[in-house]
Amino acid sequence: MQVHAKMKLTWVRRQFRHPRMLCLLICWMMITQAFSHSVPMKISALSDNHVLVSLTPEQRYLLLPIEEDEAQAALKVIVDNEVVETLNVKLAADHVDYSVPLDLGRYTNKPVLLDVTFHNERRSTGDVKDFTAWKAMQSVAHFDTKNREKYRPLYHHTPLWGWMNDPNGMFYKDGVWHLYFQYNPYGSQWENMTWGHSTSKDLVHWTFEGCPIRPDGLGTIFSGSAVVDKTNSAGMGKDAVVAFYTSAGTSQVQSLAYSLDNGMSFTKYDGNPILTDKVPDFRDPKVFWNADLNAWNLILAAGQQMNIYSSKDLKNWTFESAFGREYGNHDGVWECPDLMKLPVEGTKEAKWLLLCNINPGGPFGGSATQYFVGSFDGHKFVCESQPKVTKWMDYGKDHYATVTFDNAPDNRRVALAWMSNWQYGNQVPTQQFRSANSVPRDLGLFVDQGETYVSVTPSRELLALRGDKVSHPTAACEILIDLRSQAQPTTITLSNAHHEQVVMTYQPKDHTFSMDRTASGITDFSNHFKAITIAPTHGKLTQLRLFIDKCSVEAFDASGRMAMTNLVFPRVPYDKLTVSKGARVTIYDLK
């Protein structure tokens, strides 16, 4: 480092003769070096694809340079002859797309060994010691999370960096909404599943809190849920937060962890796993308190069905029944269930809603959320529809893994989804991060022509985002379109100067709403992205609510009868709106 600094000063003296300028630049370099510098390291190539890297980190984070087109390399972090962390990472061979932080704060100024095994066959033709990764690694005190992505949403939750998919473990406690999520902190594509954690007081503005549940000997951490144990059922403490998740190792088993600090940190239960089975796809436990049964219920995906269990103590579970073999869509894997009791609009009746996420098998390809309505006595769910009836919660291509918050105030059922699709989620044109959650939605039930359907309404917290009324769309806005007087088809077009557009059509006679994103902007990253999606409206639409946010368009019937979520990637934001004659339009800039 001293030689490197000396070379810098020599260059400065040649370029700048003015003493004041020279002094300022020297101070700037000293400040820069205090926060970021290359790491002295020894590279030992054991074979064409196996490297040992010896280093002594001087600051908290080691920046790992990523090249997305490369294959995963297996990396072990070894301190004092013990493996303290294992991960898979696409280390840069030729160039750096972006960097991700490896937190070595516990080992500052201690010898650290990185054991790296590359899996790509091309490694045998190159000298691994010369890879760009070793030259580009930096030790930094703080990781810069400043947004450099033009498609990062303004009012949707996103990870600061890395990959995110399913929302997990969501609960509300003491005025704070807690969102956990499937997270890869070491790259912007799926890998290294960990629970990330964010908190919010308004469901809109989120603070990243870290990764409280990390992989262990049982495997990586797949999806699950969390509950507030108000009566100390589990014996972990009154009001403890108890989390349930799938440990995905050589098999998929269910594990438990508990928190005594409102979900900021977790202790894994010594008796893990708490639930096992021989089914290969055995995952995503959703736990809830059933007041009718005066006990806890757990529902999880088990192959092509949902298994239901009961418990008094959250640790010992009794199998009750299975649902789904003959019901709904089975074109893909069933996963991420939820089960809840909801009032039926306009009646004094309540029914049970079972959410079942499926991939593939969605109505327009890839992943989607189907659901069933019926009765549940704590032991068995009975669907009221015919077995071949399939109902979809959202008729866009980018709404998946929908689950709800536990312990929400006012008996609300607030849902979040992953706003992407497994057909192309790893390829969308962002790098620093990939994926966002949908806007929060309140769920209910309504009846149309003898069938009961789920109602989906944007949560009331979104109203606080409204800023000034504006005359044209912005990159982040809400558009209200009054359709009460529309007897003929209504066409709504969002467009920009690049002739990119999203075309929506309401057909009052057919009771359908469609969205065409085939010319919406960048679409060539996947053959599956161009699409026209169509939804039933269950009667006449009175008002359409459109939420636009950098890379998404979410459309809702104001009364909750229809929802449609689609990603879009315009080269510049849509700034023009055209609507068929007769429809009144109001646009709010969202702040």
Name every feature range the model reports, one short phrase each.
Residues 41-81, 104-123, 143, 346-348, ...:
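Beta-rich accessory regions
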Residues 43-47, 83-102, 131-168, 187-190, ...:
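Surface loop/turn signatures of beta-propeller and other carbohydrate-active proteins
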Residues 73-74, 125, 190-194, 251-257, ...:
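Structural motif
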Residues 1-17:
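N-terminal secretory signal peptides that target proteins for export/translocation
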Residues 74, 80, 151, 158, ...:
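Beta-propeller domains
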Residues 196-200, 255-262, 310-312, 367-378, ...:
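Beta-propeller blade signature
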Residues 23-33:
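Bacterial N-terminal signal peptides
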Residues 64, 114-116, 166-186, 208-211, ...:
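Hydrophobic core segments of beta-strands in well-ordered, beta-rich domains
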